Amino acid sequence: MGYFVGRMTNPTRIAAALCAALLWAPAPFGSLDPAVAGPVVVSTEAAAPPATQPAAAPRGRAYLFRGALGPIFSRGMDSLTEKLENVGIPANVYEFTICPLIAERAIRDYREDPAPIILIGHSMGGLCAVKFAEMLEAEGIRASLVVAIDPAHVTPEVPLNVDRFINIFLAKDVLGGGDVKAKAGFRGHYASFDLSQHDEVLHINIEKNDTVQEQLVNKVLQLATAKAEGDPLPIRYVVPPHAPIELWDSGMAVFARPGDSMQSIAQAYHVPLWSIIQMNKGADRTPLVPGERVIVPRHLEPPLVAVSGQVPSRQ
């Protein structure tokens, strides 16, 4: 519980810390039967390809977790699970309270049938997703994709076994607001998106955002083919209030040519100017110095659908 020290600045955070402590206590959760504990299973196993066809690349297993009072406030996890199932990704949704038990089961399943592991959680479920990844790390297993959606403030740092991490949060929110960092030495793809300037986005509807859900489904579908050249650079954004919510995977370094400016680089890489300015403080000169390094956000694979500017209504 060392990561709770100094974090309990208000009653809401104290409650979140207590929930986290109960969640990761060795008992009684380790003995729970998920059939009794009540995860709502929305998935079925994906159908096997015809015998005459070559085996498809493994598309992974997705484990999704609701937050506190999840059946009331985290229903977006259920709809996201259904969307993953509809495109052939085995996916289950659970209450965060049985997270350790599900992680133990996932480890056993992986030993029998290795497949990419995807972890997605909302609120306390976001904390669960990161702790789940820590359990995998202890067993020498990688997590292909971890997504935290407005996770609890007490969420720990991202462990080194995570290939891709995305944090979508509301910095000023007392129910979530977890600004999750990665551990020193992290070499995976890291992207953090603060939506606090989007007034229409709340803790209780952020996981229901159709634009966010569609992009996450795309990222899961592209796990087998997503590649990137060069070392990934972490990116952290405060998304402007009227900007579409676009979930890049990480950043990459490009080098200015004679006559280049922030505007010309943004146009060349098809990204909004604000995304270049935020990641390159102090480099707003025009023109840039030839050879100057500029960090540009990127997708590991082109989005399967265009990112829309639609935002969720208050629900």
What are these regions (language model features)?
Residues L69, M77-S79, L160-R236:
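Lipolytic serine-hydrolase domain surface
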Residues A15-P28:
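Bacterial N-terminal signal peptides
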Residues F4-L18:
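Bacterial N-terminal signal peptides that target proteins for export
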Residues R236-A253, P297-Q315:
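Intrinsically disordered, low-complexity Ser/Thr-rich linker and spacer segments
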Residues V239-H270, E292-V294:
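Primarily a LysM-type cell-wall glycan-binding module
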Residues R59-A62, T81-L84, A91-F96, E104-K183:
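Serine-dependent carboxylesterase/thioesterase catalytic core
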Residues V42-E45, P49-A115, L202, V238:
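Active-site catalytic motif of lipid deacylating hydrolases and related acyltransferases
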Residues P26-V41:
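Signal peptide processing junction and immediate N-terminal pro/mature segment
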